[in-house]
């Protein structure tokens, strides 16, 4: 018969091996994947907005200097006037009333029903001189014009470079149906990069 020595020391117990922690590399990879997906979605949505809401145009001429220069590239908002009215000082793009194959870009000066008059280069709307900080002194035209009553659903537009602008002083007010966008952002050249909010490739003539 075999006996067991009660005094024999027991073998030491081995602690259980803890479960491995989640891989840090795997977690980081998932985060990068999610971040990349969200970035691509954001870029895609931005492109959709630009394509459907905005239109790139090229400015030709200097009549909107110094705000816009010849060959400058800008975006116009094509749908803004479906949701809000045209405002004074808006820089708008429209089909040239005398040749609908051409587009012009000018600033809105007179609204429907208003009286527009120019005396020694100062523009009066309904008998009151309007403030025009966007027209530098060297670009002022001291000629007289009007008075003229702007017909309903039409707008009196002028270039900021008054001396070289072919605008409503020449071809008269522009019908709202010919106005198809508002200038909102300049993107080229890079030193002009920024908003064109009041202080939207086709070719836009600003002569």
Describe the function of each predicted region.
Residues 2-37, 48, 52-58, 63-207:
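Soluble "head" domains of membrane/secretory-pathway proteins
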Residues 43-45:
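Single-pass alpha-helical transmembrane signal-anchor segments in small membrane proteins across taxa
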């Amino acid at each position: 018969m075999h006996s067991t020595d009660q005094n024999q020391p027991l073998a030491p117990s081995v602690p259980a091996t803890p479960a491995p922690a989640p891989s840090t590399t795997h977690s980081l990879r998932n985060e990068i994947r999610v971040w990349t997906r969200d970035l691509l979605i954001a870029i895609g949505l931005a492109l959709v907005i630009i394509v459907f809401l905005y239109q790139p145009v090229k400015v030709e001429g200097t009549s909107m200097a110094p705000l816009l220069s010849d060959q400058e590239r800008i975006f116009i908002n094509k749908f803004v006037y479906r949701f809000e009215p045209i405002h004074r000082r808006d820089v708008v793009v429209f089909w040239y009333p005398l040749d609908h194959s051409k587009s012009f870009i000018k600033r809105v000066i007179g609204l429907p029903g208003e009286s527009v008059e120019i005396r020694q280069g100062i523009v009066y709307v309904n008998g009151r001189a309007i403030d025009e900080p966007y027209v530098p002194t060297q670009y002022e035209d001291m000629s007289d014009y009007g008075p003229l009553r702007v017909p309903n659903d039409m707008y009196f537009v002028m270039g900021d470079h008054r001396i070289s602008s072919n605008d409503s002083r020449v071809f008269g007010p522009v019908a709202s149906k010919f106005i198809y966008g508002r200038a909102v952002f300049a993107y080229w050249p890079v030193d002009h990069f920024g908003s064109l909010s009041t202080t939207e490739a086709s070719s836009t003539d600003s002569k």
